């Protein structure tokens, strides 16, 4: 799962979970482009597919600790472990999953899988 992005299925699931506006913002694409990707009207560029897969993994980690509303809010809430920044703030322009900011976001979400408390 870690290295197998499937934009069509992950995109529709994340769109349903996060909502079009938040998902487009996190992917750093316009809502119109996202709609076209999800409808299959336009091919998903590789960098966007990688971001989509990354967000699906993060959302999967969060699902064990938060309900759908909590998952959506998690991305915009400042976190002490992120130096007071929100996860969305660390997903900076043209981010790649292997960049330091996104790695910190993934590590924080992944830590919830092992935490007995939220």
Where are these regions (language model features)?
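Non-transmembrane "mature" sequence context
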Residues: 1-118
């Amino acid at each position: 799962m870690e290295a197998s992005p499937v934009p069509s299925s992950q995109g529709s699931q994340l769109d349903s979970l996060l909502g079009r506006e938040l998902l487009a913002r996190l992917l750093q694409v316009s809502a119109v482009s996202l709609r076209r990707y999800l409808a299959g009207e336009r091919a998903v560029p590789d960098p966007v597919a990688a971001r989509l897969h990354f967000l699906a993994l993060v959302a999967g980690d969060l699902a064990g600790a938060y309900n759908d509303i909590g998952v959506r809010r998690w991305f915009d809430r400042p976190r002490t472990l992120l130096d007071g920044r929100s996860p969305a703030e660390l997903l900076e322009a043209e981010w790649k999953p292997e960049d330091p900011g996104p790695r910190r976001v993934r590590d924080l979400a992944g830590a919830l899988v092992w935490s007995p408390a939220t």
